[in-house]
Amino acid sequence: MAKKKRNPSAEEAGDGEQTAAELGDFETTLGDVETIVRKLESGALTLDDSLKQYEVAVAKMRQCYQLLDVAERKISVLAGVDAEGRPVTEPLENMSGGESLVQKQASRGKRRGAVAPDHSASDTTGVDSADLDSAEDDE
């Protein structure tokens, strides 16, 4: 009896998660996508071949995104040091805390002793008040 060929697009359509080893190497997969893009941009392929290559590239991009998801889940961020001097880590997703980038910048600045920039809506003209004072003195 003949062996069935593997159909990667059918496997990806399933709900089961794949490990990084099953997905392959990110750099190699991304390199494959870049090679396909160069072929498509060259214009040397027929329409049918171009569509087939496009489908392969889309499947490989999905594979790249899955590899990035696996890598992101593995990343942990240093949260501090315990009483015995050992590093304490937290998963990456726990570190965001729902803060905006401006809030994170302000809290980081406070820890470093810097003054956070004023992003208030009161000065929306873009004109510095010192410039206005000097303009009045000129009159």
Swiss-Prot record:
Residues 1-26, 82-139 are annotated as: Disordered. GO terms for biological process: DNA catabolic process. Pfam families: Exonuc_VII_S. The keyword Phosphoprotein does not apply. It comes from the Bacteria. It is found in: Cytoplasm. One of its GO terms (cellular component) is exodeoxyribonuclease VII complex. InterPro entries: Exonuc_VII_S, Exonuc_VII_ssu_sf. Its EC number is 3.1.11.6. GO terms for molecular function: exodeoxyribonuclease VII activity. It catalyses: Exonucleolytic cleavage in either 5'- to 3'- or 3'- to 5'-direction to yield nucleoside 5'-phosphates. Residues 130-139 have a biased composition (Acidic residues). Heterooligomer composed of large and small subunits. Belongs to the XseB family. Bidirectionally degrades single-stranded DNA into large acid-insoluble oligonucleotides, which are then degraded further into small acid-soluble oligonucleotides. NCBIfam families: xseB. This is Exodeoxyribonuclease 7 small subunit.
